[in-house]
From Swiss-Prot:
RNA chaperone that binds small regulatory RNA (sRNAs) and mRNAs to facilitate mRNA translational regulation in response to envelope stress, environmental stress and changes in metabolite concentrations. Also binds with high specificity to tRNAs. GO terms for molecular function: RNA binding. It comes from Oceanobacillus iheyensis (strain DSM 14371 / CIP 107618 / JCM 11309 / KCTC 3954 / HTE831). This is RNA-binding protein Hfq. The gene is hfq. Keywords: RNA-binding, Stress response.
């Protein structure tokens, strides 16, 4: 059986590895800006000005990076 591609993990990993700054739009309307430092199935760790924020994925609406992210072709 073919392995399914997890676009979300690929996308977040590229943001993390390439240190791409992002604006994170939350479902309550707030915007957070920073770098993705880590992520798992339920959370994203965002760093802004040396401070970290752990954001639950269910509270995230959109990631808007400052530049396009290319996904690995596997």
């Amino acid at each position: 059986m073919a392995q399914s591609v997890n676009i979300q993990d690929q996308y977040l990993n590229q943001l993390r590895k390439n240190h791409i700054s992002v604006t994170v739009f939350l479902t309550n309307g707030f915007q957070l800006r920073g770098l993705v430092k880590a992520f798992d199935n339920f959370t994203v760790l965002l760093e802004t000005d040396g401070k970290q924020q752990l954001i639950f994925k269910h509270a995230i609406s959109t990631f808007s990076p400052v530049k396009n992210v290319s996904l690995d072709k596997e």
